[in-house]
């Protein structure tokens, strides 16, 4: 690039393309794999890596004490994510593996597997084609810190580590009633999860080593080792209480596994706030603009500014304002495009509200190349909206605004002269709210990765939810 032609302006299409196709993340992943494997032919290695297209497959480790439900959660995750479940038992039962035969023979004599053999079994399994294509979920492995370090040294790094915990008394009670289906491998319980089918009931088997004393010994051993394993995964670890319904544990685990970790990729926020009249879109946009320097784009305000500036767009808009008619979408999109193609929007990002209001407008916005990368729907019930808006008043003398409940006028004299904006009438608000919710279903379907935020709470609490949704990567879709 010629330095004499500075300052250089990067076309907005370039960062948009990089963001849409995850170019930065792809290059980062390739560099990581090159450093881990150090191939003699890097070009061929990168071509093979790209053809696999497996950067986003699940790589999960689930740990927990006996009877914490880790195997059940791992099996459910496997089914939901279409991945591969890997347990110590499945590694020992593998056919056509010399290591499995050796490990099984050792286990039958000593009831344990040496760290080096277990890690070699894990490496052999994870390098097979199905694990490379679909990912893997390790159930109860690693068992010791030494195993965790050996696995990391081989470059087999999980993306998410889940640790289940519960009080020992609960775990002992659970373990005593555990039963296993020898056909499917599903785990049941005599009290908490008894199968309704008589056929399954009749074939259930009681596993060995589940007495109270044996369970207590296993718990002691687990607690001794887990505190040394956890420091190996400081940034990808999530602890979940398993002393709750299994479905709730699974939901929390699935939500975490589908979430992405923060990346170093350049990110320019392009935020769209949707919500009914009085949902707080304007306030949230102002807060985002103040904290992160985003350009606050209010569709209605842009149209008013164009008319006030007597621009070419303003001359087109003014007749519609005078007749109190809706400005055509074609004019609105041109005004928006003129604002959003300016350098401050390209460099800093933007937060848009007031547009789109229906599916056609959303498609028009996308066709112009201004597709938001974060969409938030502020959900507020009608009663709260009416309370917020119908009680607003304005002092015609000072221009000061009041709210009869939250900011009442200081004196009776001021209260008597207060006026209400016609747009704050109950009839108008109900009409506008009904119009929004009539179109919101199509918008939510169009922006299928939108985040729904409860807007009926303190505005700074709402802001924290929106801020979290912008800073953290969006959850990945399950294909």
Swiss-Prot record:
Spans annotated as Adenylate kinase 1: 58-258
Annotated ATP 2 binding sites: 278-283, 392
Catalytic activity: AMP + ATP = 2 ADP; a 2'-deoxyribonucleoside 5'-diphosphate + ATP = a 2'-deoxyribonucleoside 5'-triphosphate + ADP; a ribonucleoside 5'-diphosphate + ATP = a ribonucleoside 5'-triphosphate + ADP
E.C. no: 2.7.4.3, 2.7.4.6
Region (LID 2): 391-424
Record-listed ATP 1 binding positions: 67-72
A Gene Ontology molecular function term of the record: nucleoside diphosphate kinase activity
Domain of life: Eukaryota
GO biological process, alphabetically ordered: ventricular system development
Region (Adenylate kinase 2): 269-471
LID 1: region residues: 177-206
GO cellular component labels: axoneme; cytosol; sperm flagellum
Stored Gene3D superfamilies: P-loop containing nucleotide triphosphate hydrolases
Entry keyword set: ATP-binding, Cell projection, Cytoplasm, Cytoskeleton, Kinase, Nucleotide-binding, Transferase
Main location: cytoplasm
NMP 2, as annotated region: 298-327
Reported function: Nucleoside monophosphate (NMP) kinase that catalyzes the reversible transfer of the terminal phosphate group between nucleoside triphosphates and monophosphates. Has highest activity toward AMP, and weaker activity toward dAMP, CMP and dCMP. Also displays broad nucleoside diphosphate kinase activity.
Family: Belongs to the adenylate kinase family.
PANTHER family on file: NUCLEOTIDE KINASE (PTHR23359)
Protein known as: Adenylate kinase 8
Species per Swiss-Prot/TrEMBL record: Mus musculus (Mouse)
Protein's gene: Ak8
